[in-house]
């Protein structure tokens, strides 16, 4: 994965699955390298679960299998997985780009790898989307929605796409994925 960022800079939460609302089974405050390394290497059985999701024959089966994945709260530290549970922001925003062709995803990946504020991106669990972690200068919980919309607008203007609107919610979890070609820029700037 290369150079690690200052681990004290970006503290986030990981949860065992979508139902783990109080973060009982994983370290409460982890550095971003823990989920990023898992995404890149497929450890903790993640690669096998992602292969099963990508090879599922129906959307219902894919959705059911996704429920067993770890979820990451890139937005910050939460005592509970709801908006009132956020105690501090990481300054990170996760943009979720869904249902794109391989050609479109390749173009987006190539373009955003040159954007200095993109910290990381990786294929979504379904394989036809992209999760993009953007560094911002916002540490104010009340301003998260506005910050998200500004980042979202950058993607809309650049690619003519509308990222998943659910991610505007402060407590929206991100399913972990597997992508050995994950992009990581430890020197991303707001």
Per-region residue spans from a language model:
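DNA replication initiation on ssDNA origins
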Residues: 1-91
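DNA replication initiation modules
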Residues: 3-25, 78-103, 136-190
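Hydrophobic, Leu/Ile/Phe/Ala-enriched alpha-helical segments that form helix-helix packing faces
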Residues: 54-60, 112-116, 151-159
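Intrinsically disordered, low-complexity regulatory regions enriched in Ser/Pro/Gly/Thr
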Residues: 86-87, 113-114, 125
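Short amphipathic alpha-helix segments
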Residues: 100-118
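Short beta-strand
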Residues: 120-126, 164-169
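A generic structural motif
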Residues: 128-135
């Amino acid at each position: 994965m290369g150079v690690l960022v200052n681990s004290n800079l970006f503290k986030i939460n990981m949860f065992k699955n979508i139902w783990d609302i109080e973060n009982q089974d994983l370290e409460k405050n982890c550095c971003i390298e823990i989920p990023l390394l898992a995404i890149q290497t497929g450890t903790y059985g993640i690669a096998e679960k992602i292969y099963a999701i990508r090879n599922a024959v129906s959307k219902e089966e894919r959705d059911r299998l996704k429920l067993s994945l770890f979820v990451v709260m890139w937005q910050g530290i939460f005592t509970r997985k709801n908006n009132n549970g956020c105690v501090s922001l990481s300054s990170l925003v996760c943009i979720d780009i869904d249902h794109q062709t391989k050609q479109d995803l390749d173009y987006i990946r190539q373009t955003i790898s040159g954007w200095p504020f993109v910290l990381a991106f990786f294929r979504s669990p379904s394989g036809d989307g992209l999760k993009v972690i953007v560094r911002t200068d916002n540490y104010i919980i009340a301003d998260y929605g506005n910050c998200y919309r500004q980042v979202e607008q950058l993607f809309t203007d650049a690619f003519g796409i509308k990222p998943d609107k659910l991610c505007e919610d402060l407590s929206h979890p991100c399913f972990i994925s597997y992508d050995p070609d994950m992009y990581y820029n430890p020197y991303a700037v707001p």
